[in-house]
Design a protein with these regions (language model features):
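N-terminal glycine-rich phosphate/pyrophosphate-binding loop and immediately adjacent elements
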Residues: 3-143
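Rossmann-like flavin
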Residues: 97-209
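Helical element adjacent to the flavin cofactor pocket in flavoenzyme catalytic cores
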Residues: 216-268
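A conserved FAD-binding loop/helix module that cradles the flavin
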Residues: 59, 478-500
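A glycine-rich dinucleotide-binding beta-alpha-beta segment and adjacent secondary-structure elements
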Residues: 189-203, 360-366, 419-482
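C-terminal segments that line or cap access tunnels to active or ligand-binding sites in enzymes
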Residues: 327-437
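Active-site-proximal substrate-binding core of FAD-dependent oxidoreductases
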Residues: 262, 501-518
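Mid-domain catalytic core of redox enzymes
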Residues: 249, 258-377, 517
Length: 518
């Protein structure tokens, strides 16, 4: 494969990772064709519009705008030419079942003051936690981000094992520790700890099972802030689609892929569409779920079996999403809100160990009209409610489970967030269940966040962006490195494009060395 190959690079899937890959590759001079099964581009970052209400259907929080800036910079563009980003502060409001509330502020000095009023003595622990989070972020920037990584060996193989500071970095990364233990070693107050635990909800995993390195998310959010794109998070994929079109990418929504084609040496050579058309390609970037890519798009290949044997990947959690169009705004809400469970341990035990919906769940509530009134008719609200649930388990029929669980959710909002009259103000309603998410987005077992980040040692690692088994195949999206969440999915697309471009400029697609087991 060469950069000037007559064959285009194919992108399978038009989610955020696929769109990012397409833009970067096109900006670097590659011919690119993108295939997307759905009639829209953007994957989970879709939109629902009805009766004067507009809802972001998937992600609602934009963090790390530096990732987006990097993608647009590939084409010599500035992000503000495409997006109008508004900084949100407070970043979240937390509601507890004892009637107290706590705002998460971006500026540490303001947060220290909040904490010392809320839980005297917690400010110093939070300050130390942020210092530790910043160290973890520095290590992530050095070894983990913007490179194809599938294991701890990949993190360090580009660096001498005897390089200065390596041992210190290995110690500071907190291997063998969980997010929950790290948080509580700094901030023992249970309510403050519950707030900090929820940084891991960006990756759909239990803080008790996730590696401490994910505490770095706190620094990332404090450093770069939380942002809202006017027009909703749907504006992000629309901006990428606009950039891709300007760069000459051949965008094909409504064109699903049946399988990825390989030659006798199991090198990716093209795709077969669901209509039966076979298209030769210089290389393939799969923005489909990485496990389903191997099970379905590469079914029958030796590589599929190797992928499954290398490591047992578990789906991240799923969720129930309620889209409620209201004729009322709730003044106690800010843009982003967490309505917390009474007992976090019992909640996570239900979701991640028992595989059942939590009887007393935490509800994430997005009330965007405070920032963009146009999302609803005057005086109204386009309320988005997300409650994490287990990924799909055998025997779970969400068409029967949803009505009862909807009542649980609304009762939680009434008892803990004071939304006692919510039912009477609903003028429009829609929803997604784990089964809907599984069917709509073709993800593993209805997982919202790709693969779980569980495991105190290997939990941070997802499949590498350069396939270990199939030359010419690259992986992007929330189930590939560096993992789930809006900025990470975008970064995965950049990485997949970057390593593909490196291989193209070298004139060959070489099979990478085997990654050692963790």
């Amino acid at each position: 494969m060469t950069q000037n190959s007559s064959k285009p690079v194919g992108i399978v899937g038009g989610g955020l990772g696929g769109l990012a890959s397409a833009c970067v590759l096109a900006a670097r001079g590659h011919k690119v064709v993108l295939f997307e099964k759905s009639p829209w581009l953007g994957g989970k970052a879709a939109v629902l519009e009805a009766d004067g209400y507009r809802f972001d259907m998937g992600p609602t929080i934009v963090t790390l705008p530096s990732v987006l800036k990097r993608i647009f910079a590939e084409a010599g563009k500035k992000i503000d030419q495409y997006l109008d980003l508004v900084l949100l502060d407070p970043q979240w409001r937390c509601f507890y079942d004892d009637g107290t509330t706590l705002d998460l502020r971006q500026k540490p000095s303001e947060m220290y003051a909040e904490l010392d009023k809320f839980a005297p003595g917690s400010a110093e622990g939070y300050r130390r936690f942020l210092e530790y989070s910043a160290k973890l972020n520095d290590i992530s920037q050095k070894y983990f981000f913007y490179r194809s990584v599938g294991s701890i060996w990949d993190m360090f193989k580009a660096n001498s094992l005897f390089s200065p500071g390596l041992i210190t970095d290995m110690i500071n990364i907190g291997m063998g520790k969980s997010v929950a233990s790290c948080v509580r070693s700094h901030v023992p107050d249970p309510k403050v700890a519950q707030m900090l635990d929820h940084f891991t909800q960006y990756v759909g995993s239990s803080p008790e099972l996730s590696p401490a390195v994910l505490c770095s998310i706190a620094h990332m959010q404090t450093d770069e802030g939380i942002w809202y794109p006017m027009g909703g998070t749907r504006a992000v994929p629309l901006a990428l689609v606009k950039l891709a079109s300007e760069l000459g990418v051949d965008l094909r929504p409504g064109c699903g892929i049946r399988r990825i084609l390989t030659d006798t040496s199991e090198r990716a050579t093209g795709v077969e569409t669901e209509s039966g058309e076979k298209i030769e390609l210089a290389a393939v970037v799969s923005n489909s779920d990485s496990v389903r890519t191997h099970r379905e798009l590469l079914s029958g290949s030796k590589a599929s079996g190797k992928f499954e044997k290398r490591r047992k990947y578990e789906a991240a959690c799923s969720g129930v999403v309620l889209y409620l169009g209201l004729d009322k705004r709730y003044e106690q809400l800010v843009h982003h809100n967490f309505v917390f469970s009474h007992n976090a341990e019992e909640e996570f035990e239900a979701i991640y160990h028992k595989g059942i919906p939590a009887p007393d769940p935490t509800c994430y509530v997005c009330a965007p009209s405070i920032t963009e009134p146009a999302v609803a008719p005057p005086g109204g609200e386009a309320l988005y409610i997300l409650v994490h649930t287990p990924y799909l388990r055998p025997g779970q029929d969400w068409s029967k489970m949803l009505p009862d669980y909807r009542r649980v959710i609304l009762q939680k909002l009434a008892s803990t967030a004071g939304m006692t009259d919510l039912e009477s103000h609903i003028k429009f309603e829609s929803f997604l269940t784990p089964q809907d998410i599984h069917d709509r987005y073709r993800v593993l077992n209805g997982a919202i966040y790709g693969l779980a980040s569980h495991g105190k040692y290997a939990g941070a690692f997802k499949p590498a962006n350069r396939s270990q088994d199939i030359p010419g195949l690259y992986l992007a999206g929330g189930s590939a490195h560096p993992g789930p969440g809006m900025p990470m999915a975008l970064m995965s697309g950049w990485i997949a494009a970057d390593v593909l471009d490196i291989d193209a400029r070298a004139g060959v697609v070489t099979k990478p060395a085997r990654t050692q087991p963790v």
